[in-house]
Amino acid sequence: FLAAGLPLSWVAKQRKAFQAYLLQNREVEFSFRRKDYRIRIVGAAVYPQGFAAIAPIVNRFTGSNMLCDIGNGTMNTLRALDSNVDLRQMFTEKYGVQQCVLAIQEALMREHHAELEEQMIHNFLRYGTVGIDEELEKAMKLTASDYAKKVFRKLREHGYDPRIMKLYVVGGGGCLLKNFFPIAPDKIIINSDICATAKGYEYMADVQNVTGGAK
């Protein structure tokens, strides 16, 4: 059984089409870590990205909260008052980590005539350094910090107010914010578990009992 997801504001319109896509091949063969598998797909469910990561704990939310899911291609936001999710306050923007990667590549070429592989830039965003020339890393840090500031600008456009809200950040962009933006740990909670969303999909499928016992 497959439990997968789509960006928050795309789920309503694209769920059925994506579900059909996931089920187009019921018998699948593949290799993973030098082991061969043959599986039979018995069903599929599609859930909102980002929300899946907080689904197991949302019933413990109190006060005003905002979820920010920063993936590779999109940034999704969702508001919740106590444990009640407000579906009217759900937004998706094409402002994921890849936009930051492209901005860094452009800055390095423009300012230093240097090219850097995308994987090294992703590692820099994740760890804060990749051990290259100091001036290059300085330019990368400035660009990443500017991207992080723009993320919070977009959050404010969607109603984020750090004076009254807690912010929950999930997705790969969480490490970026942690490394390149001053985070108040009592107001901004970053979930750095890269499997959090996948675990959330499994949790929601189990809660809704849609798997029929399939694992």
Give, region by region, the residue ranges found by the protein language model.
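Short, basic interhelical loop/turn and adjoining N-cap
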Residues: 112-116
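Short beta-strand scaffold segments in enzyme catalytic cores
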Residues: 75-79
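Active-site-proximal alpha-helical scaffolds that flank and shape metal-associated catalytic sites
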Residues: 68-72
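Nucleotide/phosphate-binding catalytic cleft detector across ATP-hydrolyzing
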Residues: 1-65, 84-99, 119-215
